[in-house]
Amino acid sequence: AVALYTCEFYRACRRALRPGGVLSLHVQSPIHRGATMARLLASLRSVFPVVRPFLQYVPLYGTLWAMAMASDRADPLALTAAEVDARLARHGLNDLQLYSGDTHLALLSLPPFVRRLLAEPARPVVDGDSLDDPSLDPGAERTLRLVRG
């Protein structure tokens, strides 16, 4: 599966997309696989000029999960809530349970711990690499503080 997260694979995806096309994919959990998430986003950024991570709680995984949208020019942050709602209405998607213009912007609003994680340098994944994540070490200290104290 590592081959699906490499710069080489992302270059092939970019070639397959039409201009303005968007690749959307999951990029692991910022809580449990932070180092891997950072590397996957570094890989995407090495290929696509626009990369926007977004977060959603995924009940199946029991944790916050990250996805990303990557494009040569389409930027999901450039859309207003009203524009997203208008596009949904135009396509007859009026009864969605999660997604709306407001949630579009909320999903793309990264919390401070994720912004700090992504501010650190990360090495892109290339053919032949592994996705071993040192943060998976059971002895590694991981603290997610939701309140002061």
State where each predicted segment sits.
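A short glycine-rich, Lys/Arg-flanked "PGG" loop and its adjoining helix->strand segment in the class I
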Residues: 5-19, 41, 45
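Short, electropositive alpha-helical surface patch
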Residues: 35-53
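Ligand-binding pocket scaffold of soluble enzyme catalytic domains
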Residues: 7-10, 25, 41, 52-57, ...
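Conserved class I S-adenosyl-L-methionine
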Residues: 1, 27-41
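Generic secondary-structure boundary/loop-capping signal
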Residues: 1-2, 105
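Conserved beta-strand signature within the Rossmann-like core of class I S-adenosyl-L-methionine
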Residues: 20-27
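Soluble small-group transferase modules, centered on the S-adenosyl donor enzyme superfamily
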Residues: 53-149
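Generic recognition of short, well-ordered alpha-helical segments
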Residues: 4, 8, 35-39, 65
